[in-house]
A protein has these predicted regions:
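Helix-coil boundary/capping segments in enzymes
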Residues: 1-182
Length: 182
């Protein structure tokens, strides 16, 4: 999903010498898989924070795995959004805005076109808004709505800064017009 010209810069999971996984993101030190807090399905004494593998871990696998785990936990469905610590806040450290925005778009497309359609009543996806500027935020909001995702996660103000500006009103108005929860 990431454009070919940016694939070598895309975040990815790599295997460490200890056999565990780590997340490799441009501009960031390696983050071992313990960033996911993979405690789901394990008693406290069984959890080991290092040498963990992402593949097959409870709570983060395929949509089919997610549905099985919902059944095991007695859940009718769940709202899906990325953990800020392991996703959008780290991706923002990618300094080239076009590369960064392509990561956001790839995630939203994957969630809306592949993952949630497996069972849209039980896998309720929330798209991610880029932290760049209001134009980009509104454009991605419109794209997320077309994908059929049910809302958006916003880790910064629509203007991309940590403080609000009057220009943010365009984003809020668009979200209201689209009946899109933020």
């Amino acid at each position: 999903r990431v454009p070919e010209k940016y694939r070598n810069r895309a975040p990815r999971t790599i295997t460490l010498p200890n056999g565990g996984d780590a997340l490799l993101i441009e501009g960031q030190p390696l983050r071992e898989a313990n960033f996911l807090d993979l405690r789901a399905g394990r008693a406290t004494g069984q959890w080991q924070p290092f040498g963990l593998r992402v593949e097959g871990a409870a709570g983060i696998g395929s949509p089919e795995q997610r549905i099985r785990e919902q059944d095991e936990d007695g859940l009718d469905g769940e709202v899906l959004f990325p953990a800020q610590v392991a996703g959008p806040s780290l991706w923002r450290n990618i300094t080239h805005n076009d590369v960064y925005k392509s990561m956001i778009r790839a995630y939203n497309d994957w969630l809306g076109e592949e993952y949630c359609p497996t069972d849209p009543e039980r896998l309720i996806g929330m798209g991610i808004i880029p932290w760049t500027n209001v134009d980009d935020a509104v454009e991605e909001l419109e794209h997320i709505a077309k994908l059929g995702l049910k809302g958006v996660v916003l880790g910064a103000h629509p203007n991309g800064k940590s403080f609000p500006l009057p220009e943010d009103d365009r984003f809020w108005a668009a979200a209201v017009d689209m009946n899109m929860p933020v």
